[in-house]
């Protein structure tokens, strides 16, 4: 089972270079498993025992199965994750011609580690909006092949490189696509129109706009002398999206279970498709149109916010609190912060710990050093939006927000097992 899950994650990462592709891949898998697509613009006709999903902006998705028990009396089991990851996104008018090279201007999305983006074989993917026969349409594209790179400056020309070098995102990050003659004027929109034709057989009249991201073409892999690790891009947080989906498929039929994967977590979640927007609440209110039933159900529910945790690094162990150093392959991590950067309470932490113990899943705890700041997740945002009890957890990870992150090869199975047990829990605290 462990190897099968790890390979499934690797395949999902390859199919998901952007939040749009990550959402489309989840939707395709749900559809194949018998889940029915719902349209927010149309009336919904749901029933007990039904399994459904709905997307927003092509970059966020909520999937749910409706159990046979009244929601107002038994609540919902919710798992939350996010589809976005730090990356380099193409600017609206990106064309640059410098020293005989065609480059694209990029904007840094989220808190990316920038140095690892140099000297990588990069491709480009995302969503393109275009007009065709008088209609405005959108399609996802993925060049798949290495079409760009950001070469480093040789150390002979930058002797201080190994003593620390501040990267100027405006000047130093535009990837090189091609070498061009002085009289050439490359047209990026024409390139996108050509890709639409090659990938989808479409003839676009005008490419109107796009949301495109560069990504590393090196595929994820199980690595290490004994296969102890999974290395890959976007483990934060597609690992949790994938684990939540597998757990949803493992859930028993009696409880109402929800998987919510929102966009824009890396930039604050304040959007129509982010956790700080109305997406989840609006979906739940369509399932519970009566206000009293809605309030009762929320107060009987629990959310597991799943987002990667910082594993203690052997070369930088002093960056962790001495008593709270999560280890790879030692199970999911309960994340705690007194200043509510995480939404965990003693009650929700105790429930999750008990769930792990009952299902023989190892569990760990994380709190930041008292002299360091702490990141956050969708947990506090969703808890404050809905008033739902929440526990923040995640799998331990190295190199978070790098172009290539590292997690333990045993931990995915641990997470799927405990999330599946949560979805099937007859009683919540």
From Swiss-Prot:
Zn(2+) binds at residues 82, 156, 401. CDD domains: M18_DAP. Its cofactor is Zn(2+). Its EC number is 3.4.11.-. Keywords: Aminopeptidase, Hydrolase, Metal-binding, Metalloprotease, Protease, Zinc. GO terms for cellular component: cytoplasm. SUPFAM superfamilies: Aminopeptidase/glucanase lid domain (SSF101821), Zn-dependent exopeptidases (SSF53187). Pfam families: Peptidase_M18 (PF02127). GO terms for molecular function: aminopeptidase activity; metallopeptidase activity; zinc ion binding. GO terms for biological process: proteolysis. InterPro entries: M18_aminopeptidase_2 (IPR022984), Peptidase_M18 (IPR001948), Peptidase_M18_dom2 (IPR023358). Belongs to the peptidase M18 family. PANTHER family: ASPARTYL AMINOPEPTIDASE. This is Probable M18 family aminopeptidase 2. It comes from Stutzerimonas stutzeri (strain A1501) (Pseudomonas stutzeri). The lineage of its organism: Bacteria, Pseudomonadati, Pseudomonadota, Gammaproteobacteria, Pseudomonadales.
């Amino acid at each position: 089972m462990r190897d099968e899950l790890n390979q499934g994650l690797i395949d999902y990462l390859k199919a998901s270079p952007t939040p749009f592709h990550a959402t489309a891949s989840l939707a395709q898998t749900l559809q194949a498993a018998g889940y029915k697509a719902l349209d927010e613009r149309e009336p919904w006709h749901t029933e007990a025992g039904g399994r459904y999903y709905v997307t927003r902006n092509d970059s966020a998705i909520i999937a749910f199965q409706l159990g046979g028990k009244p929601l107002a009396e038994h609540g919902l089991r919710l798992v939350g994750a996010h589809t976005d990851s730090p990356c380099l996104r193409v600017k609206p008018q990106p064309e640059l011609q410098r020293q005989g090279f065609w480059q694209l201007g990029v904007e840094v999305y989220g808190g990316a580690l920038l140095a690892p983006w140099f000297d990588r074989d990069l491709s480009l993917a995302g969503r393109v909006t275009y007009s065709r026969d008088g209609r405005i349409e959108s399609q996802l594209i993925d060049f798949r092949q290495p079409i760009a790179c950001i070469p480093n400056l040789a150390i002979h020309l930058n002797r201080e490189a190994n003593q620390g070098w501040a990267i100027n995102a405006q000047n130093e990050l535009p990837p090189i696509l091609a070498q061009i003659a002085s009289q050439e004027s490359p047209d990026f929109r024409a390139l996108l129109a050509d890709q639409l034709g090659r990938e989808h057989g479409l003839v676009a009249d005008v490419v109107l706009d796009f949301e495109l991201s560069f990504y590393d073409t090196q595929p994820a892999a199980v690595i290490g002398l004994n296969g102890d690790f999974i290395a890959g891009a976007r483990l934060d947080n597609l690992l949790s999206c994938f684990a939540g989906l597998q757990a949803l498929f493992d859930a028993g039929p009696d409880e109402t279970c929800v998987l919510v994967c929102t966009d824009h977590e890396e930039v604050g979640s304040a959007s129509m498709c982010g956790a700080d927007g109305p997406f989840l609440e609006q979906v739940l209110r369509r399932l519970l149109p009566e206000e009293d039933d809605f309030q009762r159900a929320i107060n009987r529910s629990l959310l597991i916010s799943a987002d990667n945790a910082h594993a203690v690094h052997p070369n930088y162990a002093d960056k962790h609190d001495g008593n709270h150093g999560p280890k790879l392959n030692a199970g999911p991590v309960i994340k705690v912060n007194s200043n509510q950067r995480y939404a965990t309470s003693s009650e929700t932490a105790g429930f999750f710990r008990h769930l792990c113990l009952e299902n023989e899943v190892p569990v760990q705890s994380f709190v930041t050093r008292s002299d360091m700041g702490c990141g956050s997740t969708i947990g506090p945002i969703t808890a404050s939006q809905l008033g739902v009890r929440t526990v923040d957890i995640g799998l331990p990870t190295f190199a978070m927000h790098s172009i290539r992150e590292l997690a333990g090869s045993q931990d995915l199975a641990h997470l799927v097992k405990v999330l599946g047990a949560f979805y099937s829990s007859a009683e919540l605290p």
